[in-house]
């Protein structure tokens, strides 16, 4: 039952279907399994950051203590938040999009 989303992804990505048309929510181990499937021997790039670092990139960054409450902080945070989890777990992604994370 744990691999059901991955099996659905495989079934829909068979011959005669467009890779870009198959969009799935893939989170946690399902996301990792899908990356192994898509990337194969090439492997994939995955470098998780600590939750604190992702939530407050400027506070924990090189300007720590110098930035204060500037209006651009929220904009910077939104840029940092984009990644494979944002793209494929919080939203949906296709096999084609997963390939962007392969080595």
From Swiss-Prot:
GO BP term, example: glucose metabolic process
Cellular component, GO annotation: extracellular space
Record's keyword terms, sorted: Carbohydrate metabolism, Cleavage on pair of basic residues, Disulfide bond, Glucose metabolism, Hormone, Secreted, Signal
Residues making up the propeptide: 53-80
Protein name in UniProt: Insulin
Main location: secreted
Disulfide bonds: 27-89, 39-102, 88-93
Family: Belongs to the insulin family.
Role, per record: Insulin decreases blood glucose concentration. It increases cell permeability to monosaccharides, amino acids and fatty acids. It accelerates glycolysis, the pentose phosphate cycle, and glycogen synthesis in liver.
Signal peptide limits: 1-20
Compartment(s) of residence: Secreted
UniProt lineage: Eukaryota, Metazoa, Chordata, Craniata, Vertebrata
Quaternary structure note: Heterodimer of a B chain and an A chain linked by two disulfide bonds.
Encoding gene per record: INS
InterPro entries reported in the protein's UniProt record: Insulin (IPR004825), Insulin-like (IPR016179), Insulin-like_sf (IPR036438), Insulin_CS (IPR022353), Insulin_family (IPR022352)
A GO term, aspect molecular function: hormone activity
């Amino acid at each position: 039952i744990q691999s059901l989303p991955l099996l659905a992804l495989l079934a829909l990505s068979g011959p005669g279907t467009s890779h870009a048309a198959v969009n799935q929510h893939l989170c946690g181990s399902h996301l990792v399994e899908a990356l192994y499937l898509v990337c194969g021997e090439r492997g994939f790039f995955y470098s998780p950051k600590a939750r604190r670092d992702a939530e407050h990139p400027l506070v924990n960054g090189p300007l720590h203590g110098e930035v204060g409450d500037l209006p651009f902080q929220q904009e910077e945070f939104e840029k940092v938040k984009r990644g494979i989890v944002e793209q494929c777990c919080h939203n949906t992604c296709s096999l084609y999009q997963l390939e962007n994370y392969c080595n």
